[in-house]
Swiss-Prot record:
Record-linked InterPro entries: Metal_Hydrolase (IPR032466), Uronate_isomerase (IPR003766)
Reactions the enzyme catalyzes: D-glucuronate = D-fructuronate; aldehydo-D-galacturonate = keto-D-tagaturonate
UniProt pathway annotation: Carbohydrate metabolism; pentose and glucuronate interconversion
One GO BP annotation of this record: D-galacturonate catabolic process
Cited SUPFAM superfamilies: Metallo-dependent hydrolases (SSF51556)
Gene responsible for this protein: uxaC
Molecular function terms from GO: glucuronate isomerase activity
Protein's name in the database: Uronate isomerase
EC nos: 5.3.1.12
Family as reported in the entry's similarity comment: Belongs to the metallo-dependent hydrolases superfamily. Uronate isomerase family.
Top-level taxon in the UniProt lineage: Bacteria
Annotated keywords: Isomerase
Lineage: Bacteria, Pseudomonadati, Acidobacteriota, Terriglobia, Bryobacterales
């Protein structure tokens, strides 16, 4: 039997029935990812397996480094085939890491390759995959069609012109591609060398002059309006933790003015400015019926040496352990008091916070929007089988699992769509075990619609995207 077979990860007859009946054929709504919209607009055709699979993949780079592979074959200038060979030699060493599952699931689904990837099979895999990539079968557009992706939400800076999204909308592509408003740089008053060039770009994008806090906020709103006009209905924030030391408008303006003059905000000032801006962003989202996403808890760029050499997002990040409950509860409560709490999805990176988040979301359900505040799917280091189960169990135990928005790729790679399949198999295995243990009724009419909703329906209804 092939390693990746029809019943992969499905440990019971009931799980297999649930998956093949209710989950397998559901479309995909990838409501948070990092796909380059330029690649979609250009209908990129990938030259080889390296380009589509290893280019920019920090998950693989971390594994390769741990296997003794030099940086030249991760992010460096080694030839593409040599980098691929270094990965192929690494794969057998990743046993019990989710990379081993993902690698073989992706080879099977994209190229029909059944054999295990290792040093001995690498040349055959390279040749077979590249032969498919040389045809029109796996261009960016064809991949989205192949995996029945109804919509993709990219992650975009407020200063982005969204020209690629406009081109995609005009192309006739069946998959809708929407922007997501990610204004992280708007908080960087503690780093004027980053903040001020960004504000300068914001001036250009908003076609306005920015010298005061009021003008800054007006420019932010103009860009938020533009994203809305382009079909965007989600925002996203990558922050260590929520901010809750709310300053006055005057104090926020003072911190902004000093940053514009090149004076770095202190840690306390940064926290206050961030708290002020996160309220601004929450109000904007609520006014337009958007969904706010909070990605909490990543400790980034741990290796100063490697960050200086290679920059961000190259594989030097890990799980942080900041306290989350107090500031998060205070932030959500402040918006709720103003009747300005938008639909919200909270993703935590530290599994120690699972029950914190699973219980926190119950404090702010409004009795109008089902599942208004959501515990997001396992993120980054937690988007693997065990951590998916942890998240699902915490949400089930403390909340309304049936209203869960389900999976997203959170990926830069066009090869990541089988992660939705992976999630769905884990989901159906969970329900199957419960049924076979007598903990849930063996009733397809009861459980089947819940599985379908978690796979697609809940997200489709909740997010308000024009899909």
């Amino acid at each position: 039997m092939s390693f990746i077979h029809d019943d992969f990860l499905l440990s019971s007859k009931t799980a297999r029935r649930f998956y093949h009946t209710f989950a397998e054929d559901q479309p995909i709504l990838d409501y948070h990812c990092h796909l380059p919209p330029q690649d979609v607009a250009a209908n990129r055709q990938f030259k080889d397996l390296f380009e589509i699979w290893l280019e920019g993949d920090h998950y693989k780079w971390r594994a390769m480094r741990a296997n003794g592979v030099p940086e030249s074959h991760c992010t460096g200038n080694a030839p593409a085939y040599e980098k691929f060979m270094a990965w192929a030699k690494t794969v057998p060493a990743t046993l019990r890491n989710p990379l081993y599952h993902w690698t073989h699931l992706e080879l099977k689904r994209y190229f029909g390759i059944d054999e295990l990837l290792n040093e001995q099979s690498a040349a055959r895999v390279w040749e077979q995959a590249n032969a498919v990539l040389a045809t029109p079968e796996l261009t960016a557009h064809r991949i989205l069609e192949k995996f029945h992706v109804k919509a993709v939400c990219t992650t975009d800076d407020p200063t982005d012109d969204l020209a690629a999204h406009q081109a995609i909308a005009a192309s006739g592509l069946a998959t809708k591609v929407f922007p997501t408003f990610r204004p992280d740089k708007a908080l960087h008053v503690h780093a004027p060398e980053l903040f001020n060039p960004w504000v300068d770009r914001l001036q250009v994008a908003a076609d306005t002059h920015i010298s005061t806090m009021a003008e800054f906020l007006d420019a932010i709103k103009k860009r938020h309006d533009f994203f809305h006009a382009m079909g965007g209905r989600l925002s996203d924030h990558g922050i260590n933790h929520a901010f809750s030391d709310f300053p006055s408008e005057h104090e926020a303006a003072r911190i902004f003015g000093r940053a514009r003059c090149g004076h770095a905000a202190t840690s306390e000032e940064h926290g206050k400015f961030a708290a002020y801006m996160m309220l601004v962003f929450g109000r904007l989202d609520a006014e337009k019926g958007w969904t706010k996403q909070l990605h909490l808890g990543a400790r980034r760029n741990n290796s100063t040496r490697r960050f200086r050499e290679l920059g961000a997002d190259t594989g030097w990040d890990s799980i942080g352990d900041w306290p989350q409950a107090d500031a998060l509860g205070t932030y959500l409560d402040r918006l709720d008091l103003e009747n300005a709490l938008p639909k919200t999805v909270i993703y935590n990176l530290n599994p120690a916070d699972n029950y914190v988040i699973a219980t926190m979301i119950g404090n702010f359900q409004d009795g109008v929007t089902a599942g208004k505040v959501q515990f997001g799917s396992g993120w980054w280091f937690l988007d693997q089988k065990e951590a998916m189960q942890w998240q699902m169990n915490a949400l089930s135990n403390c909340g309304m699992f049936s209203k869960f928005l389900g999976m997203l790729t959170d990926s830069r790679s066009f090869m990541s769509y089988p992660r939705h399949e992976y999630f769905r198999r884990v989901l159906c295995d969970l329900f199957g075990r419960d049924v076979e243990n007598g903990e849930l009724p063996d009733n397809d009419e009861l459980i089947g619609p819940v599985i379908r909703d978690i796979c697609y329906g809940n997200a489709q209804r909740f997010l308000g995207l024009n899909v």
